[in-house]
Amino acid sequence: MKKISIVAIGLVLSSSLFASSSDDLRKKAAGANLLPIPQSQAEVLKLVDVATNPITDAKVELGKKLYFDPRLSKSGLISCNTCHNLALGGADGVPAAIGHKWTANPHHLNSPTVYNSVLNSVQFWNGRSPHLEDQAQGPIQAPPEMAAPKDLVTKRITSIGAYVEEFGKAYGKKEKITFEKIADTIAVFERTLVTPSKYDDFLNGDDSALNKSEKEGLATFIDKGCATCHGGVALGGDMQPFEVVKKYKFAKVGDFSGDKNGMVKAPTLRNIQETAPYFHNGQIWSLKEAIKEMGSIQLGVAINDKETKNIEQFLKALTGRKPKIEYPILPPSEEDTPLPSTI
């Protein structure tokens, strides 16, 4: 009986210390402005919805079809999902985005993930768009991307009776279908692409959600100063100074220099295990190398191998639970639908 009691007491003490350690780490995370995706769907909706373009089931379903429809591109070959592939972490897995006529991005910019992009404070690497509705208009028109003028996109969509009917259900039959409305609808779908992870489970109170290495990685991530730029719910997503201490070793690949003040949007770290290659020009393929490079150029510290391994384990814990997306059957083109062009 005495042995059993001692073992039981030991287990209770161990459990108590474990809980205390987890509570301390959560407090540390909160102090570093690391915030979880809420557990409640109602709270998530408050986080991602906007009064100017509210989420409805009809808009989400229509937006999903438009997101996957290559007819929004001039060639009829490229959809939003081409560069922001929902099966590939919301990115495309190549250093620089490939667009119209198989042209690589002229600035050698990497495609950011669309997952959790609603949590960003700005969109694009130079932060030029304030929200998803504005962002969705850019790639469709950009010559090196989808290369489709506004009028062409609108004519294609309005020529397809099934789309006209769906827009009527989503917005009312009197609402005019415009290019801006098409982009707004895509944005509604993108707002639903939020991926809570076991990291969020831990911050929301589940002590066992992260293992020892992941917790050590989270603590190291905070202690080294990584959360300074990769904080908030998004773990990034806002404008930050780049090359604070020294030059990025691949700075000469591409001509991107940030916004007018040299600031760069810090990418979200959510699902980062799935979104290699890394950095704005996609020149680093491993998390280990990315961690060490960031320590050097941003923080001015040499992150040792053990610390790097722990941070890497933490970053992998940010891989989230994806919403189930059923690939849509798109409505057929009609006789007066403008034809694709590769010119």
Name each model feature, range by range.
Residues M1-K2, A251:
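Generic cytosolic/nucleocytoplasmic N-terminal low-complexity/intrinsically disordered segments
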Residues A19-I343:
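Periplasmic c-type cytochrome electron-transfer domains
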Residues K2-F18:
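Gram-negative bacterial Sec-dependent N-terminal signal peptides
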